[in-house]
Amino acid sequence: MKKILFPVMFLAVIMASSCGKDDDPTTPPPTQNVDMTKATIERTSNNSEFKEAPETLPKQITTNTVLKTGKTYLLTDFTFVLNGATIKIEPGVTIKGSKSPNKGALIITRNGKIDAQGTAAAPIVFTSNQATPNSGDWGGLILLGNAPNNGAKDGVAGLQAVEGGVNETATGYGLHGGTKADDNSGILKYVRIEYPGIAFAVNDEINGVTFGSVGSGTTVDYVQVSYSGDDSFEWFGGTVNCKHLISYRATDDDFDTDNGFSGKIQFGLVLRDAAIADFGPSGASNGFESDNDADGTTKTPQTSAIFSNMTIVGPYANATAATTAAPYKRGAHIRRNSKISIFNSVFVGWPVGLFLDGALTEASATSNALEYKNNTIAGCPLVVAPGTATFNSQTWFSTAAFANQTLAAIADVKLTNTGYTTFDPTPATGSPLLAGADFSSAKLGGGAFTTTTYVGAAAAGDTWFKGWTKFVNK
């Protein structure tokens, strides 16, 4: 097909309507004009289709900026949103992250904000700029806020530097943490993030979406991370609540919670690929992984996130144990003094369903600070990992009042389809997930959770995971 290139000269003026995270200042940051004078339009001679070359985003965004519907943008490096500025991303925008020479990433600093409101018909897409994309092609999306965490930096309690090589000593752009539980980092809605996730160093990575001390004033709803080279979602402290999260064919963990994260998460989907796992020296691919901190201390705030209505489909759903990558471990690994709670959820096809790891975590389970109730574990050779000499984890899991159930085979749970490209996690006729949810725990009160009768992320006939999502092979 013959292509004719027409250089053009034009200017895209980007307007914005929001400012920093706190009260609107008297004088809002000026609108940023993004230079489009060197853009090129490509015309294909057979259909007169015009394609605008991607616009490269600057390394620093210091004024309110709008990314316009129908356009494509490029992250060639770390791009920081600073100085109370807001980056507004309109529905249908595509943002591509570079693979080399630098990995692109978008970082919303704790003095910046994002307003990314796609729609079911026109989601916002972050993806790789490679013709043949792969896991870990680019960095990812990082949101930093001023909510509490249990870390410390340079002797300052509650201050942390985000992982992934983002923090710069001279600027502190990667710092997060404070005392504002209701801090607002903006909005993520109907957003796909494809092929992100890089290991900057051992235990120092950028995930699909990284939340650093993000507050409960932030809105996160309908977000899919696909083919992350590390975790899909990781929270370091913070209080943000999230709904309708999807982790698709991740490398490391799907939902990783650390450093005092205490948010509430409902309606989460996971589908794992038996061949894609964390093959690093200490790699362990889990559905949930949760620590209070790296050393398992008693620092506060303690990691205490609450999850409900999660469907966590592991590698055995599409493979046998013999053909599943060795790093695959547990549907949920709760360790290092974490006390997260999980309700009304289903774990399918993992080597181990649940592992409560360590005496402090077991103590939280005994005291009901950590709750695991109305959950189903299906097709896991080891349902619950053994506890210590003073804690029988299987007996605890099987407590009648907890209403947990075990199913021997993956087929017994009767999900509609667990195929990689035909994924439909709704419960089919006769599924035990159609009923059995319970929202009587005080942890599920307060209005953050939607009461359901079904267990798992989707009701029979549900479609919330369709239309704006993408379930494809690489």
Model region roles, listed by residue range:
Residues G20-D23, N33:
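Low-complexity, highly charged intrinsically disordered N-terminal segments
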Residues M1-I4, G20-K21:
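Positively charged n-region of N-terminal signal peptides that target proteins for export
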Residues I95-K96:
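Primarily the HKD phosphodiesterase
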Residues T27-T69, L75-I87, S100-N111, G118, ...:
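Extracellular beta-rich repeat passengers
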Residues M15-S18:
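C-terminal motif of bacterial Sec signal peptides marking the signal peptidase cleavage site
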Residues P123:
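Aromatic- and Lys/Arg-enriched surface recognition patch
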Residues I4-V13:
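Sec-dependent N-terminal signal peptides
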